[in-house]
């Protein structure tokens, strides 16, 4: 519960900061009336509209909830699969899976996030190249066949034989 509250407060601070400096749009069901500087576009139909938002946004920002300590957030993969440029808070597992600055971009503080937004808004070709490389990696390595192959490659010897004998 505490992690969720901290995440909410971090996201509010981020949204308010970005709304003051950039053409920042938020797509959420959350009530933001107390924050008139935030442009809340409301929720989108995930299947129909989210891919258009992810692809059409110059920069998609993802803030990982504090309760999530490991793994690759599904939302990051969804953005990348739509050829969207993603700016996400630093996470060790993301750094292991993706080449920072080549397939996605990570930040470690609100100040660094703002700096990187400024930079990538001014460097469109670089931003598009990162989005394209991220898309290619997700399509190539984050599908069921690739994941199953990776699981089978990492299995202890004898597991497949045990599974065959079990059925």
Predicted segments with their positions:
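Short alpha-helical segment that forms part of, or immediately flanks, the ligand-binding pocket
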Residues: 51, 74-81, 95
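Short helix-capping/hinge SLiMs at alpha-helix to coil transitions
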Residues: 69-70, 123
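Nucleotide-sugar donor-binding catalytic core of glycosyltransferases
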Residues: 1-69, 85-87, 91-94
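C-terminal amphipathic helix plus adjacent low-complexity
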Residues: 114-167
């Amino acid at each position: 519960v505490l992690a969720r509250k901290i995440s909410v407060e971090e996201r509010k601070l981020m949204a308010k900061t970005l709304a003051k400096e950039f053409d920042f749009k938020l797509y959420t069901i959350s009530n933001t009336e107390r924050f008139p500087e935030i442009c809340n576009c409301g929720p989108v139909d995930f299947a129909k509209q989210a891919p258009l938002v992810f692809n059409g946004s110059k920069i998609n920002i993802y803030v990982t909830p504090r309760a999530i300590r490991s793994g690759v957030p599904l939302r990051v993969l969804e953005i990348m699969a739509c050829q969207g440029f993603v700016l996400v808070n630093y996470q060790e597992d993301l750094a292991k899976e993706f080449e920072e600055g080549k397939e996605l971009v990570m930040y470690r503080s609100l100040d660094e996030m703002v700096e990187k937004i400024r930079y990538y808004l001014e460097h469109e070709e670089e931003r598009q190249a990162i989005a394209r490389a991220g898309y290619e990696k997700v399509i190539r390595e984050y599908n069921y066949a690739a994941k199953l192959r990776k699981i089978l490659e990492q299995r202890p010897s004898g597991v497949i034989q045990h599974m065959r004998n079990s059925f």
